[in-house]
Structure formats: C-alpha cells, structure tokens
Amino acid sequence: MSTAVTVSDLRKAYGEVEAVRGVSFEIAAGEIFGLLGPNGAGKTTTVEILEGYRERDAGSVTVLGADPARADQRWREQIGVVLQSSAMYPTLTVAESLALFGGYYEHPRSVDEVVQLIGLEQKRDSIVRKLSGGQRRRLDLGLALVGDPDLLFLDEPTTGFDPQARRRAWESISSLRALGKTILLTTHYLDEAERLCDRVAVLREGRIAAMGRPGELTGALPPTEIRYRQDGREVVLRTEEPTRMLNELTQKALADGRELEALEVRRPSLEEVYLSLTEEEKE
Amino acid sequence: MRLFRHELRYELRLYSRSRELAFFTFLLPLILFLMLGFAYGDDELNGVKGSDYLLIGTLGYGVVATAFAGLTIVIVLRREDGILKRLRSTPLPAPTYLTALLTTTMIAFLIQAVVIVAVGMSAFGASFPSHLFSFVLSLILGAAAFAALGVGLTGLVKRAEGASAVVNAIYFPMLFLSGSFFERDTFPEFLQVVADALPLTYFFDLVFGVVYGGDQIWDRPQDVAALAIWGLVGAFVAVRKFHWTPTEG
C-alpha cells in the first residue's frame, strides 16, 4: 500500500513555547488516521503544517509526494481541508457555495452529488446564514469534498455538536471510506477516534504518547479490573488472568455463602488509556 | 482566465447581496448629495453652482466609501472569519482572487459614479462631464489609489470589530477636510495644511479640474502624482502586512 503522508521528527515552536517536539508518523493511502489529544497538545499545529499553512522549524514532511511548505496549485487540487471554524459566505446558498468552490478545481464533483453526500438535500437552496451549526459543519465537509480530493484534513469535525449531529457527521465521514479517501482527523473525543479511525496517535505536550489501532492501545494497557464490595469497602483487583481469578473468587464466595456485591469485570476503555497517557504527571 | 471570470461572477453576486455595502457605500453618498444639494445647491461654491460642486464631492465620497472603506471591511471580515484561510487551501491562485476582488470594487464604483452623475443631471440640472476620457481615467486612478490604501490598511487592523471603527475614524474626517462638501478656503490654516496631505483632496481637485476647469488629466500632474504616491504607499504596506489567516491572540 502506498504512503499518503510521512512525518518525521517534526518540530515547531512559537517563541519560547515548543508546540510540537519531535513527532513522527505515517499514513497509508486509504487510511483514516486520528490525532487525539487535549487542547494545546499540538494537534492543530501539526495538521496546519501538513496543510501548508505553517512553516516547520525542523523535521521532514511529505504529503502526497510533496513538501506542503513548497506546494503548488496542482497539489492543492488533491487535498481537502475542513478547518476548526466553519468559514463561508453567509449570503450564498448551499448549492452556490459548492458551485463557487467546485469551480476552483479541474475535476470537481457535481453539486448535487455533494449535496446528497452531506445530506443537505432539503437545504440545497437555503442561504448559509439560515443553516444550523450542524448543517454548516456538514457544508464545511462538502466544500472540502467538492474538489474530489485524495486526502482530507478534518480538524475537530464535530466539536460543539449535539449527539445526534455527531452521529450524522460520523456517518458522512464513514461513507468517505468507501470512496477510498485518505483522512487525517483531529479530535479530543475518544469515542469519535474509536468509531472512525483505523489508527490513532495520542499527542501529549507535543509528543506522541502512544500510537496504534484503537484496539491495540487498549490491549497494551492496564490489565482487567475486577471490583466488588466487601463489608462496605470497595475491593479492586487487577489481573492478567481474569478467568482464573474470577473463578477463585466466586468459588470462595460460594463456599462461604457470601454474595460478591456490586461485582464488576471490565477492560480499560480507550478513555482510561487516554487519560493515563495525557494526564499531567503528579509530583 | 477561466478562474478569474468564475471568481468575478461570484464576487459580483456577493457584492450585490450585501445590504451593508449597498447602504453605506452606495445609498448614503446619494442621500447626502440630495440633502446638501437641496440645502445649498443654488449657492455658488468655488466659482461653480453649489450642486455642481457637490457632485464632485459626492464622487469623492463614493470613492472612499466603495474603494477604501467597503473593500477594507470586506477583506478584514473575510480574513477574521477564516474565509481567506479556506481559500488558501484551494487551487485558486492568490493573485487571481485579489484581482477579481479589486475588479469588483472598480465595477461597483464606476456604476456608482454613473448613478451620481445621473442624479446630478436629473435633480440639479448638472451638465454631462466634459473630457469623458480624462474623467473616467481620473475615477479609475482614484479608485485604484484608495483600493491600495484599503488593502494596506487591512494589514494594520487586528480584529473584525475594529474594522469599521478604524475605517470610519479615517474616512469621515478626510471627507470633510478634503473639502468635498465645503470650500477649503473657509477652514483655519492648520486644517488646510492637513487637507493638503490627504489623497481625497487631490482626487477632488483632479476631478473638479477635469469637469469644470477644462483640464485633461495630464494637465494636472501634481494631483495625479499625489494620488499615485498614496496608492504606492498603500501597496507597499499591503505587500508587507497583508495576511490570509486570522490575526492570532
């Protein structure tokens, strides 16, 4: 499989503040890759360097075979960008906005096809000013898609959405997988990364704290937890062999004629992995 | 060229749909023209009929409102909204975009000039401007100089909310000091010194000279030079300070 994005030892500082301190990763063509991390972890800086908006201080970056800092119009034909804030002309209709931006590309998708893809058929001829926040965000995605790019950058595509709008956006993004697009998305929502991404890199203070498939990340971490209450106190056991430990526990409890109150067996969620990776180290 | 036509078509559509621009840059100068024209259009100002004098003043008002104020505010709003940033991620070349935007401004101002002259002729019996070629060239020179100043100014304005405040603080005093609505001779001397530095003063004198003084544009090299210098100052600042992404922090 060919590589769409290669980042190697990327560094960027703003004055004294080092926003990105040696980040390396690769994204294969057709992959959905997530950059996950809290605010200020360096996600947007990294993405904006890949989009060609910012100059890097050190490291090498190749996006679709070119250095974004020196990219030309032909390169821009192949990328689509959804920025954190949806910026569009408030007095144009949905269809006009798509036609305007589509006109910048050699081989745009048809307006109606994109309208359907983002599920705004009912709003096709409404002006942007009258759209809801979620509808604007979907048009945002449409504007990034109308040039039929190979690579899409989505910077926090669902921040500020209500749960229903997020699910709709997820469906739109998932449907792009079928089109064979490579996607780099940033998010601080774990469920979003878990749901959408093939692979995830967790950024923390400008470095990659962990990287892998969402399942691998959870697998690499703390073992299974068994919790129950005894004499009003909570007992927490961690084990690599949950089956055996659970068997021993229940046998003993049965023999004693006791109930294991509030018994719970759980694997760590990506959330806990994430928190353990991104939490400030305590003194 | 295809991209330029595409962008120009949409810029004109965006312009025509903007109520703010329609009112502040198009209607307000006309309203003031009519009001002042009925108030002292029959007096004599600077050796011509008051309404004829006001016609030139209104063209000056139009050029700062459309080419300077309107353009500055549109660019700052688009920049701070992130629209310019989004455009940078598309294959639309920056020069094509800016040329289309400036052409739109120029077209809007020339339409406005036609309307101002038509109102002057029908409401106050003004005569059709003589030396049409020099007249149009003077309007274009003025619009270009003020557009350059406007683009330059965008680089110095940090926030969207600041744009109209800064623009108004510059252009209303300039409008009055340049003598667009009253004769400058009646001002105290220090204000006349300020007026002598303002680009609008030279635009007014140039157009006045072409329309009522029997001059061609090349008979007034001092006015042309002053406008050109101001335009170059604007262009110089624009090249150094113009930015595509929202001002941070």
PLM regions and their residue ranges:
Chain A
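Conserved ABC ATPase "signature" region
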Residues: A99, G103, P108-R124
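Conserved ABC transporter NBD signature motif
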Residues: G59-D67, R74-W75
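Short, charged/small-residue-rich alpha-helical element at the C-terminal edge
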Residues: E216-E283
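ABC ATPase "signature
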Residues: M211-G212
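Catalytic Walker B motif of ABC-type/P-loop ATPase nucleotide-binding domains
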Residues: L152-E156
